[in-house]
Amino acid sequence: MQKTGKALAVVMLVVVSSSASATITVLEKNTLTDPWLAPLSLGVSGSVRPEFIWHRGEDNHAGHDGGTRFRFSADYLLRPGTSIIGFYSLGVDTAHALGLKHHYDHDRSWDRQRKLFGGIKDDRYGTLTFGHQYSVYYDTIGGKSDVWGNDGNASANWIGVGGDYDGGERPRNSLKYKNTFGDLTLYASYLLPQDELVLDNSQYYRRKRGGGIGFDYRLAKDLTMSASWNQTNATVRGAGATQRHYRQAFSGAAMTWTPGNWYLVSTATMYRHYVPAVPPQSTDDYFARHGYGLEAFAGYTFPINKPYLHSVQPYFAVDTLRLQGNEHYHANHSYLGIYTQLAYGFSVYLEQTFTATTANDPNVTSLSIYYDF
């Protein structure tokens, strides 16, 4: 019965979303006559993402869920230019929810919270939010290069112990401020303590506190320079009484250039006690002492403007990750792909990843189908 209920929930979400290929406005402002409810607006959007991956290895299989998510937003207008806002994003493993037993990780739940935050937004004084949300690093650096299929192998987003905990991508219990002054956008965040995260080998990670600052500066209409500095204080403890305090630090810079139909971006990030050592080490040396990651992407969009074919974007990307400590780990990836935007919110990524790593990871071919609404 529980599995049937989960399956029906996923099917209902997909069916409801199929009526449009843009964000659905569930409730517009001034729709309700009650003066307390009239300032409220509600929206729903999402992305359904089946994915197929082929490579040499034991976990090579025909298909799985590539990151389906559903988003719910609310905006309550207090006065012109000032609103209370809320946002919730639910990640759903559709293969798990539908009981396709050979196409999902049986050790993970069928659903997970991606974001949950609220706050106040003001046209003059900026936006202040609290909860489970994107980090300053992701807003300024990581999100700029999060634009191809198998990305994120050298940015801080998810190469740490987990972006929900260490501040790399979507930290929980975070307070964030953002404001724009002409061509300059400033960001600042503070990370509150977070519950323990279970690591491999009976080890545990606990965030004590952290924070970050960053900016985007528009040098020209199509050229933006970004930078970010972040620090997280945390402990790693073993199964016994052994533990070590780490002051994790990661700083990055990015340049984004969008002349005409081009999208060009390059990022660089420095790490200290942030990326877990490869291979895994003891509690005292759990993280690589130093490291850096580089990413670059170049894509050109050809507008087709046909009823069922909107555009095609061939692209090329590269990244490299270097770690130094008790190990000297390196990973280089090159990506060649094509992104095709179809009608009714559908799009397709076809990508080949060429890999050269210390761990001898295989090359990967991936096909991702998106339905965005």
Put a short name on every predicted segment.
Residues 31-54, 60-193, 207, 216-219:
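Outer membrane beta-barrel
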Residues 217, 257, 346, 361-373:
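Outer-membrane beta-barrel "beta-signal"
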Residues 5-47:
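N-terminal periplasmic/intermembrane-space "pro-region" immediately following the signal or transit peptide
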Residues 55-61, 96-104, 142-147, 193-207, ...:
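Outer-membrane beta-barrel translocator domains and adjoining extracellular loop/strand segments
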Residues 71-73, 117-120, 176-178, 214-216, ...:
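Outer-membrane beta-barrel architecture
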Residues 181-182, 206-208, 213-325:
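Detector for outer-membrane/organellar transmembrane beta-barrel domains
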Residues 78-84, 124-128, 183-188, 221-227, ...:
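Repeated loop/turn-to-beta-strand initiation elements of outer-membrane beta-barrel proteins
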Residues 46-52, 86-90, 132, 188-192, ...:
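Transmembrane beta-barrel strands of outer-membrane/channel proteins
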